């Protein structure tokens, strides 16, 4: 039961953080549709790299992984918004923007995850 509560709490906090980040990006960059989603996905990728690496090194309790990786990152990051935004770009015939957004999201997502892992290994 504790595991479910940890995922629930982390997911709720992650969802709130995603909402607030989206609002912040909309205020400061109103003409860039996907910046909020891009930002949370990259930050979430970095966090999950750190958290899982710290757990794998036995520096953190695996229950922290349920709270932060499964819960928070699960609520914070969003593949569905990424997919929707790409669909909107394609409907507007913005093929280059859709392609660029996809490539940049994948590249920076992997880079952020690897950076988190690297920082823990370097430790």
Curated annotation (Swiss-Prot):
Annotated signal peptide: none
Keyword Zinc attributed: no
Alphabetical keyword list: Cell inner membrane, Cell membrane, Ion channel, Ion transport, Membrane, Metal-binding, Sodium, Transmembrane, Transmembrane helix, Transport
GO cellular component: plasma membrane
InterPro entries, alphabetized: FluC (IPR003691)
Residues that bind Na(+): 74, 77
UniProt protein name: Fluoride-specific ion channel FluC
Organism field: Gloeothece citriformis (strain PCC 7424)
Gene behind this protein: fluC
């Amino acid at each position: 039961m504790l595991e479910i509560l940890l995922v629930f709490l982390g997911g709720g906090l992650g969802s709130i953080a995603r909402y607030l980040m989206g609002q912040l990006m909309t205020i400061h960059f109103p003409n860039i549709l996907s910046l909020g989603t891009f930002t949370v996905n990259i930050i979430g990728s970095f966090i999950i790299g750190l958290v899982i690496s710290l757990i794998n090194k036995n520096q953190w309790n695996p229950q922290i992984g349920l709270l932060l990786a499964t819960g928070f990152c699960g609520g914070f990051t969003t593949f569905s918004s990424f997919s929707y935004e790409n669909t909107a770009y394609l409907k507007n015939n913005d093929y280059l923007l859709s392609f660029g957004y996809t490539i940049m999201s994948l590249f920076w997502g992997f880079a952020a995850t690897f950076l988190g892992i690297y920082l823990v290994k370097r430790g």
